[in-house]
Amino acid sequence: MANIKSSIKRIRISQRNRLRNQAIKSHIKWLMKHATKDEVESAIDKAVNKGVIHRNKAVRMKSKYERSHSRSTQ
């Protein structure tokens, strides 16, 4: 455990951010199975704006979602 006050605060902040990021990512995964296309794309875009995922990964996720759901609807 860190002894410096600012280090202790940074540990707390990074843990809080990690938990928030995990929640957002798991919510996106859940949406990909249960929600509509618009809801999925909106959640992915919000995650990019919050800095949770990189924009290139967001594009890949949207593309993967499109491919999997275009096959299932045919």
Curated annotation (Swiss-Prot):
GO BP: any one term: translation
Keyword Ribosomal protein tagged: yes
Keywords linked to the UniProt accession: Chloroplast, Plastid, Ribonucleoprotein, Ribosomal protein, RNA-binding, rRNA-binding
Pfam families (UniProt xref): Ribosomal_S20p (PF01649)
Highest classification ranks of the organism: Eukaryota, Rhodophyta, Bangiophyceae, Cyanidiales, Cyanidiaceae
Homology family: Belongs to the bacterial ribosomal protein bS20 family.
Protein name from the UniProt record: Small ribosomal subunit protein bS20c
Function: Binds directly to 16S ribosomal RNA.
Compartment(s) where it occurs, according to its Swiss-Prot or TrEMBL record: Plastid, Chloroplast
Gene Ontology molecular functions: small ribosomal subunit rRNA binding; structural constituent of ribosome
InterPro entries for the chain: Ribosomal_bS20, Ribosomal_bS20_sf
GO cellular component: chloroplast; cytosol; small ribosomal subunit
Principal location class: plastid
